[in-house]
Amino acid sequence: ESRCRRNMLDNSINIRGIKRVAVDMAGYVPAPVCPTSTGKRIAIIGGGPSGLSAAYYLQLMGHQTTVFEKRKKLGGMLLYGIPSYRLPRERLQDDINVILETGVEVRLETSVGNDPGQLSLDELRKEYDAIYIAIGAHSDKKIGIEGEDAGGVISAVEFLRAIGDGKYPDLTGKKVCVIGGGNVAMDVARSSVRLGADKVAVA
C-alpha cells in the first residue's frame, strides 16, 4: 500500500481490505471440470497447503490422488497454526471443499512411517504410481535455556495446535509470558487474551 499511486492524491487504497471483502463476498466457486482420467494414481502424504494444492492440480491433470493425513482434519498449519480470528474456519473449509469436489480421496488419521500401525512407503509404492511428501513443519524449536521443559511451559506450536483441535486451554485469571516477538508470538499472545488470561507479557 505504501507504493500505491493514490498516495499522490490523498491516501492509498486499502488493498488488504479489498481482498478480504472479495474473498468473503465471492460465495461458492465450483471446482473446474477434470479431464478424462489418465489411470495414474498418486499418494500425497500430508493434508496441509502443499499437499492439498498438489492434489488439486494433479486432479485437474486427470490423475487420481489420495491424501493421507495423520490428524482428524485437513488444513495443516492453516488450521493448526493460524488462529480463526486471522483465518476464519469457514473460509478455509470452503477452499478445502472445492479441492475435494475435484475427486480427491482422503484418508484421515492415517500415519505414514516405519512404526507399528503406520503405513509404510513400500506399501504405498505398490499401490500408487507416485508419492508426494508434504509433511510440513510442525515441530517446535527449543531455545536451549534452563526450565524450558518445566511444568506450565508450552511451545507455541503445541499451544496453537491445541486451539486448532478445539482443545482450548483455560487461562482464566492467569499470567502468561510469551518469549519471542514474531508473528507466531503475536498469535499466541492475542489468543491468550481471548482465552481469559489476566495479563499477557511479550518478552
PLM regions with names:
Residues 132:
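N-terminal Rossmann-like NAD(P) cofactor-binding module of classical short-chain dehydrogenase/reductase
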Residues 18, 78-129:
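N-terminal Rossmann-like dinucleotide/flavin-binding domain of flavoprotein oxidoreductases
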Residues 44-68, 108-125, 139-141, 158-203:
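Rossmann-like dinucleotide/flavin-binding elements
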Residues 9-14, 50, 59, 84-91, ...:
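Catalytic cores of large soluble enzymes that bind and process phosphate-bearing ligands
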Residues 24-63, 78:
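Extended interfacial segments that mediate partner engagement and assembly in macromolecular machines
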Residues 135-149, 154:
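Flavin (primarily FAD) binding-site architecture
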Residues 1-22, 66, 70-73, 103-106:
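Iron-sulfur cluster-binding cysteine motifs and their immediate structural context
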